[in-house]
Curated annotation (Swiss-Prot):
Residue sites binding acetyl-CoA per the record: L77, G78, C79, L80, A81, P82, Y83, R84, R85, L86, G87, I88, G89, T90
Enzyme class label: transferase
Protein name: N-alpha-acetyltransferase 50
Annotated EC: 2.3.1.258, 2.3.1.-
SUPFAM superfamilies: Acyl-CoA N-acyltransferases (Nat)
Active-site residue numbers: Y73, H112
Binding site for CoA: 79-90, 117-126
Keywords of this entry: Acyltransferase, Cytoplasm, Nucleus, Transferase
Domain N-acetyltransferase per the UniProt entry, residue ranges: 6-155
Keyword Nucleus in annotation: yes
Compartments it resides in: Cytoplasm; Nucleus
Binding site for substrate: Y31, M75
Example GO biological process: mitotic sister chromatid cohesion, centromeric
């Protein structure tokens, strides 16, 4: 049997419906039309993941200038349940990390994860992400509503820089 192929492809107006469908199945939250309109504008920061030519997952990010930093925000990164633990999430996250590395100007990369999603938390921790805070009632209409903010620092900060970021251990 031939080895399985995992490939990443661009999100385009022709396949945006596939992305919508994947997100509806994978995530307990729904995304509005503006989300999908914005995704079409971010180029390499949004990718569909294919397993043997079947769209099974996606990653969508955006550049965020907050806290006087240039940050990459992972809006969504997910894969259909039957295709998990095959390296698809790793391929998507590595794609995003490589973009940040090549760019060289990002301070950090961050995302929100539902506090009950232990497999996602473990996944991101393997890549050097840390829980930096927990936001109460972050999600609407899903339980638990709280979200961890996971962050991976990309720049070696000089002493004193980022001293205002509170680390919370959970």
């Amino acid at each position: 049997m031939k080895g399985s192929r995992i490939e990443l492809g661009d999100v385009t107006p022709h396949n945006i419906k596939q992305l919508k469908r994947l997100n509806q199945v994978i995530f307990p939250v729904s995304y509005n039309d503006k989300f999908y309109k914005d995704v079409l504008e971010v180029g390499e920061l949004a990718k569909l993941a294919y397993f043997n030519d079947i769209a099974v997952g996606a990653v969508c990010c955006r550049v965020d200038h907050s806290q006087n930093q240039k940050r990459l925000y992972i809006m969504t990164l997910g894969c259909l349940a039957p295709y998990r633990r095959l390296g698809i999430g790793t391929k998507m996250l590595n794609h995003v990390l490589n973009i940040c590395e090549k760019d060289g100007t990002f301070d950090n990369i961050y995302l929100h994860v539902q506090i009950s999603n232990e497999s996602a938390i473990d996944f991101y921790r393997k890549f050097g992400f840390e829980i930096i805070e927990t936001k109460k009632n972050y999600y609407k209409r899903i339980e638990p509503a709280d979200a961890h903010v996971l962050q991976k620092n990309l720049k070696i900060s000089s002493p004193g820089q980022n001293a205002d970021v509170q680390k919370s251990e959970n």
